[in-house]
Amino acid sequence: MGPPGNDSDFLLTTNGSHVPDHDVTEERDEAWVVGMAILMSVIVLAIVFGNVLVITAIAKFERLQTVTNYFITSLACADLVMGLAVVPFGASHILMKMWNFGNFWCEFWTSIDVLCVTASIETLCVIAVDRYIAITSPFKYQSLLTKNKARMVILMVWIVSGLTSFLPIQMHWYRATHQKAIDCYHKETCCDFFTNQAYAIASSIVSFYVPLVVMVFVYSRVFQVAKRQLQKIDKSEGRFHSPNLGQVEQDGRSGHGLRRSSKFCLKEHKALKTLGIIMGTFTLCWLPFFIVNIVHVIQDNLIPKEVYILLNWLGYVNSAFNPLIYCRSPDFRIAFQELLCLRRSSSKAYGNGYSSNSNGKTDYMGEASGCQLGQEKESERLCEDPPGTESFVNCQGTVPSLSLDSQGRNCSTNDSPL
């Protein structure tokens, strides 16, 4: 089977419809079709609505236009295409128990399916590398990976995904040679994705397993560094809260800078966890299908068709999960609230991401930590002066970010992932 496989050669039979023996059976079949149609419609709407919201938020609010969020946009585009051009036709294939759109659209639809899943996993792999660079070279990150370079990387991801999907499918390199497959290829109402063993294994390895291994390896390194930095934060805060009052007074402002640096680090670790959840969810949703994909070409009678369809749709549902995961980020959460008119804003809104909250204070989009005007104690403010070089070194190895307070001053120094 091809990597992201469609409802494929395990789809419900296409060579005839089942004639029920009793009216009760017929009613059950009709109820099943109606129930599945409603469920699949909800899935499609969730995928389309959620990912349109993500793309719109990043396009509208400058606060979200970071290098990593460029990759998030690419991921959302892949999910959106999945929701518009793949899932609806897959639902029709199941509910109608036959393919109604001809041979050309069958192969084109299959190519889009492979394209979207390949682009998704490769984009997640790129995000992992992006975070690795941010951790190992936090002061060189902005020069190493600019927005223009990010656009080029995204373009390359989609080109490679297109070559992996459209080229072998449209050139018929994927086709099997046994009679059942040949009959399906020539039948207008059959769109079962029969593949030869070489294509099934090679495409699964290139499109899924290799990027997955790279992603897991790189991200494990990222978390190792992040864990060490959290331990440094704990030790630093332990020294700051020492019972020796003389030491605290002696440390003075340096202790305050250390605390601000620690808060910054903890915020970025939460963003790192959000990216980890996105990658983990994608893996959990698609890995079972790709395991079955390999097993099937080795032993085609081992996996029941119902299991295959279920795992395929588990992968489809992943496209609806990511917008929900992004809600962990204050940046995205506030942007979504603005777009859905769930957050009160002043009559004067700025394209750079500023908005006024219900208290009349000006927040920078996404900074839920309190970067706002007000009479706060010096020791409790996050957004005053950027952490000094000495204190920021304690945070080296975390995800760099850029955030501003209401007066436009830097709270930190680099780009923000989420």
UniProtKB/Swiss-Prot annotation:
Carbohydrate-modified residues: 6, 15
Keyword Iron in annotation: no
Motif, PDZ-binding: chain positions: 415-418
Membrane topology type: Multi-pass membrane protein
Lipidation feature positions (S-palmitoyl cysteine): 265, 341
Effect noted on mutating residue 79 to A: Small decrease in agonist binding. No effect on antagonist binding
UniProt-annotated stretches for the region Disordered: 394-418
SUPFAM superfamilies in the record: Family A G protein-coupled receptor-like
Subunit structure, interactors included: Binds NHERF1 and GPRASP1. Interacts with ARRB1 and ARRB2. Interacts with SRC. Interacts with USP20 and USP33. Interacts with VHL; the interaction, which is increased on hydroxylation of ADRB2, ubiquitinates ADRB2 leading to its degradation. Interacts with EGLN3; the interaction hydroxylates ADRB2 facilitating VHL-E3 ligase-mediated ubiquitination. Interacts (via PDZ-binding motif) with SNX27 (via PDZ domain); the interaction is required when endocytosed to prevent degradation in lysosomes and promote recycling to the plasma membrane. Interacts with CNIH4. Interacts with ARRDC3.
Classification via PANTHER family: ADRENERGIC RECEPTOR-RELATED G-PROTEIN COUPLED RECEPTOR, BETA-2 ADRENERGIC RECEPTOR
Function noted in UniProt: Beta-adrenergic receptors mediate the catecholamine-induced activation of adenylate cyclase through the action of G proteins. The beta-2-adrenergic receptor binds epinephrine with an approximately 30-fold greater affinity than it does norepinephrine.
Name of the molecule in the record: Beta-2 adrenergic receptor
Organism of this sequence: Mesocricetus auratus (Golden hamster)
